[in-house]
């Protein structure tokens, strides 16, 4: 990309989407210059890789061999550890959260939450945990890193290592289970033939001011509505 363009990332992403339009979400995922090729079997995979390399060559785009990984059944892609059976958080990112120093000002909290939010769907009741922290980022709120905020900060760091940090992939022929509660927390899970249940994703958010006035029945309906809207 030449220097001086107004929106080079968006322009390049659009270009990549155009040249790989026939492969996107079929056996290719692309984010800027990070290309992931996936297949159901090794024979098909070699064919798909050749197609990708051919497309790159035809458009005068070239890969550095030292940055390429071939024939992997587990790979680190965009902050996630992807395998045939599961989706995990990048442990180096988790360690960064574990080592994060206690916030001293609002910008520190904003930076921490911005980083942690990337993995929010791995953490059950994430929104409830961070409420004391998000309150401190609201306009007009005086800085006071109270015991509640400190507990929230430590609880979130702990949640990244003590909760279930491994998610399974959605499988079309498996039974889906959606669980929710009146606190707007929800879990999407798969039930396997063995009877075991594994989470696919977690979702949560806090109530808005008007929603806090809902009775229990309406809060439960809202939780169901939001869960099905997300998934």
Where do the protein language model's features map onto the residues?
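A short, polar/acidic, helix/strand-boundary loop motif
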Residues: 1-11, 192-222, 226
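Short hydrophobic beta-strand that contains or immediately precedes a catalytic carboxylate
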Residues: 2, 88-89, 178-180
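C-terminal reverse transcriptase regions that engage the nucleic-acid substrate
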Residues: 7, 26, 31, 57, ...
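Catalytic palm subdomain of template-directed nucleic-acid polymerases
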Residues: 16, 21-60, 76-86, 95-98, ...
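Acidic, metal-ligating active-site segments
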Residues: 182-191
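Conserved helix-loop functional segments at active or binding sites
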Residues: 18-25, 158-166, 208, 230
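Two-metal-ion RNase H-like nuclease active-site motif
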Residues: 174-183, 224
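Metal-dependent nuclease catalytic cores in nucleic-acid-processing enzymes
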Residues: 17-21, 59-60, 116-119, 217-231
């Amino acid at each position: 990309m030449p220097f001086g363009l107004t929106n080079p990332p968006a322009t390049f992403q659009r270009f990549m989407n155009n040249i790989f339009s026939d492969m996107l979400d079929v056996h290719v995922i692309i984010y800027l210059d990070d290309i992931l090729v996936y297949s159901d079997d090794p024979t098909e995979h070699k064919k798909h890789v050749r197609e990708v390399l051919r497309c790159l060559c035809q458009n005068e785009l070239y890969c550095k061999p030292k940055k390429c990984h071939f024939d992997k059944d587990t790979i680190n892609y965009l902050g996630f550890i992807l395998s045939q059976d599961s989706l995990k958080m990048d442990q180096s990112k988790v360690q960064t959260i574990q080592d994060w120093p206690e916030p001293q000002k609002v910008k520190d909290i904003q930076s921490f939450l911005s980083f942690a939010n990337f993995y929010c769907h791995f953490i059950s009741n994430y929104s409830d945990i961070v409420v004391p922290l998000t309150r401190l980022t609201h306009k007009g709120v005086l800085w006071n890193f109270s015991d509640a905020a400190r507990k929230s900060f430590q609880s979130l760091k702990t949640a990244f290592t003590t909760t279930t940090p491994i998610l399974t992939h959605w499988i079309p022929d498996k039974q889906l289970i959606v669980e929710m509660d009146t606190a707007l927390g929800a879990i999407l899970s798969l039930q396997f033939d063995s009877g075991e249940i594994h989470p696919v994703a977690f979702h949560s958010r806090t109530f808005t001011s008007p929603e806090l006035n809902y009775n229990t029945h309406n809060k439960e309906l809202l939780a169901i509505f939001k869960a099905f809207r997300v998934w």
